Amino acid sequence: MVGAGDVVTGRDADLILGTYYANELLLRLMVPPGLLAGGSEEEKKKAAAQKPPTQAQISSLVEKVAKSYDLNVVENTTTWLFERNELESNKKIILSPGANGVRGEGVPEVGEVWGVEMGLSLGSGKCKDLDHRATLHRRTNTTYILKRPSSRQTLSEIVKKFGTFIFSLRQLDDEKAAKVGVVECVRGGVLRQYEPSGELDNSPVSRLLTTIGTLAES
């Protein structure tokens, strides 16, 4: 955490500045064509006729900003469309897709809410799984008959308290019992487990998450 009285210099300063400007660029690229803050009707019509940038174009432009500070985009940095009770909807933008082959799909449209993520690294930007216990989970739409009473009890508490939102095991009434109860839930696909990950060469990384709404003029 950088305090108000601290002076950041060197590569740490590059990371902070690069993240800020890359994020500002991404936020502007998220605006659907035609949503101008000002301008004549002719200018607005001309803007509305333009095509939105593709996923590849967005990723390429953000990477150019990162490279100007000698940084790399953290692979699979993902921006999601938010829907009611759903933080990871069917539309997403993936910056610097990794070797898993997953690609983004869709572009922002008027009347949507998005969670815009930006992550840059002083290192390679490649990720690795960390040897730490996973503590973050969320419920999926998968139906599975749980056999253990402890699993059913844990899932019941999760449904009542969190719905489909992400939660930490510490937020449950009995964390020790929850550690046992979630095992079958994860194995059966009822819960998604978020595995801890970090930078491949342990270099410093930055993360920003901005919630935006692409609203029409009122």
What are these regions (language model features)?
Residues M1-S218:
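Active-site neighborhoods and metal-handling regions in enzymes and metal-associated proteins
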